[in-house]
Amino acid sequence: IKDLIKHLPEWSTPRCYDRSVLTLFSRGYLVPQPYGVVLVIGTWNYPFMLTLMPLAAALSAGNVVVVKPSNVSPTCSKLISRLLREYMDPT
């Protein structure tokens, strides 16, 4: 998460690309934009980390996230569900 916070301004700024022979009279820009809706499917082997890290990355990019915790690890799934309800806006 510290790496995400550190590099987020760099990742979200528009970038200009060099011109080539084919694009001599034009400009090329890459403008990062959110995907929209992201589905994060949790795994059973590292359910907490492999659910919350993609969740943090998708939220920081401006996406709406749907989280589906693993049903193989029910205790971690309940904990993740409870924490997300407590600290996140469900709407």
Q: Where are the regions a protein language model picked out?
A:
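Short, flexible loop/turn segments with low-complexity composition
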Residues: 15-19
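Rossmann-like NAD(P) dinucleotide-binding subdomain of oxidoreductase/dehydrogenase enzymes
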Residues: 20-91
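Long amphipathic alpha-helix in the N-terminal Rossmann-like dinucleotide-binding domain
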Residues: 1-14, 24-29
